[in-house]
């Protein structure tokens, strides 16, 4: 292990269980939902048919769970604070998720934001692997809409 990688590992180990500041709020519009439906070919009525959804279980259209998951990359502030660019780091790659849950829906027009807590740091495959618990909340809603254990690998 290089000196830079060891220093980065030690730095991140000291930040385990630290939570970052929440990201900025991000609005989930019907246009964004429709665009996501087109890209993923998931045109289920609960997402795109406002008239039918108005009589459905949520009273309106809702975002796809995977749309919520995918915008975690757009709301990087929380993640970047827990995995800052470290000396000698070439890049950070998305390695996947250990666990993903969608406890509540995201109604059209809602605003969401993320908070990230660094939970684990390990050396794997010549890289530093981090696991962040990311919570996506909906403004004014008690339950989060997504809780995920996101894995990243820092390349040195």
Q: PLM ranges: what are they?
A:
Residues 92, 97, 129-131:
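Short coil/loop residues immediately preceding or within conserved phosphate-binding loops
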Residues 2-93:
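Hot-dog-fold acyl-thioester-processing enzymes
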Residues 1-15, 102-156:
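HotDog/MaoC-like acyl-thioester-processing domains
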């Amino acid at each position: 292990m290089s000196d830079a990688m060891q220093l980065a590992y030690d730095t991140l180990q000291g930040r385990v269980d630290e939570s970052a500041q929440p990201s900025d709020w991000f609005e989930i519009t019907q246009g964004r939902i429709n665009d996501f439906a087109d890209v993923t070919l998931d045109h289920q009525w609960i997402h795109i048919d406002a008239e039918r959804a108005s009589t459905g279980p949520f009273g309106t259209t809702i975002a796809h769970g995977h749309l919520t998951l995918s915008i975690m990359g757009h709301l990087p502030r929380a993640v970047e604070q827990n995995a800052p660019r470290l000396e000698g780091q070439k890049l950070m790659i998305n390695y996947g998720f250990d666990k993903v849950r969608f406890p509540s829906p995201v109604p059209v027009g809602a605003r969401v934001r993320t908070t990230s807590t660094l939970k684990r740091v390990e050396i794997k495959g010549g890289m530093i692997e981090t696991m962040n618990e990311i919570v996506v909340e909906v403004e004014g809603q008690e339950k989060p809409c997504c809780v995920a254990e996101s894995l990243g690998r820092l390349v040195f």
